[in-house]
Amino acid sequence: MLNIIVFVLVIVADQISKNLLFNNLYLGQSVPVIPRIFHITMVYNTGIAFGLFKNQTVLFSAISFFVIVLIIFSILEQKRRKDINHLEIFALYLILSGAIGNLIDRFRFGYVIDFLDFRVWPVFNIADSAITIGMVLILIRCIRLFFK
């Protein structure tokens, strides 16, 4: 149940924050929250996470859709097995919610809205954060299995 709640909250928070910024900031506008450390900066990202590989919207939409289907099958397979790993399922739900959040943007706008700007890293969004956290959790799981 927690997985579903987090899944829904990530998508809702991601979309609400992007809509709020889309309606109140213009492209390139940067609002300091903590000057020189953290800004809200409106960026239209036609690439993937953190602005990599720009102007490939159709390709990344197709890849995102494929990844979403793959993750759903992975979650269903995990739940079918008797040795369920809750950390892995939680991580997959995080990645799934982030992928869906960004795919919604690609369908609506043809790009992803990024806005979290820590000034030393490319601008990103809540969906990117969920994907990254999910991947880190899977990496932790893999390291644990490796050293077991």
Language model regions located:
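Alpha-helical transmembrane bundles and membrane-interface segments of multipass inner-membrane proteins
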Residues: 1-148
